């Protein structure tokens, strides 16, 4: 069983957590290809492409310019600890022990516009490149064209290692759409988190992102 998450726009690179284990992204060379192209864009190009403010465009221009290999714990951070949005606040990965981290490493994947698909302990450097960005590249007109085959094949390779071949989709449509579902060798379970309010079930975005269920889906104490 594998659970899929979207990345977070909010990042935390201000301090390093006490986790020494790390891995490298499976598609670091492909990420480098996108970075090389992104480095040729101006701040105005990024503003127009990503529909972001001047300050964010300048920040991400700086991030792209500073992005460099090889990754190590001095210049990068594990993905599960670097992402800091609502989902990851609810996940509370900073509290994971060694067994929890190992289980998450096998059962959790994070879809990414820059890195394709990440294991929790994969090192990343700061970036912003959403999957839905219409970023033309050598493979097509957007990031779906760039990543679809690689991400789908990677998930198929990993799900074959599991007895339970269910893929639990907790990612957004923007990210899940990168997967070629017709070629996916696993059963897909889509999730929607709602709350009972005022006599009916409602989708509350902030609380849904912090759903404790994410923790239940990734820790080895979970009963399937």
Briefly describe each language-model feature range:
Residues 1-2, 214:
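C-terminal accessory regions
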Residues 29-36, 40, 66, 145, ...:
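Charged/polar, solvent-exposed surface patches and flexible loops
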Residues 4-95:
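Active-site helix-to-loop segments that bind/position phosphate- or nucleotide-bearing substrates
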Residues 216-224:
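Single conserved hydrophobic/aromatic residue that forms the stacking wall/gate
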Residues 11, 174, 223:
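Glycine-rich nucleotide phosphate-binding loop and flanking beta-alpha elements
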Residues 8, 171, 220:
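Anionic group-transfer/hydrolysis microenvironments
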């Amino acid at each position: 069983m594998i659970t899929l998450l979207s990345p977070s726009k909010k990042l935390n690179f201000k301090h390093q957590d006490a986790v020494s284990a790390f891995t490298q992204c499976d598609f670091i060379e492909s990420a480098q290809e996108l970075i090389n192209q992104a480095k040729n864009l101006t701040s105005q190009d990024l503003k127009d492409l990503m529909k972001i403010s001047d300050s964010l465009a300048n920040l991400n221009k700086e991030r792209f310019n500073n992005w460099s290999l090889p990754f190590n714990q001095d210049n990068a951070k594990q993905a599960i600890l670097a992402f800091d949005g609502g989902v990851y606040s609810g996940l509370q990965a900073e509290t994971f022990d060694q067994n929890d981290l190992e289980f998450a490493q096998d059962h959790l994947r994070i879809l990414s516009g820059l890195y394709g698909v990440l294991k929790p302990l994969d090192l990343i450097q700061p970036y912003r490149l959403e999957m839905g960005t219409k970023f033309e590249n050598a493979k097509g007109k957007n990031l779906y064209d760039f990543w679809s085959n690689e991400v789908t094949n990677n998930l198929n390779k990993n799900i074959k290692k599991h007895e339970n071949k269910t893929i639990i989709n907790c990612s957004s449509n923007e990210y899940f759409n990168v997967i070629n579902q017709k070629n996916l060798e696993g059963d897909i379970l889509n999730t929607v988190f709602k709350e009972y309010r005022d006599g009916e079930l409602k989708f509350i975005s902030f609380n849904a992102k912090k759903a404790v269920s994410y923790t239940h889906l990734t820790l080895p104490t979970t009963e399937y």
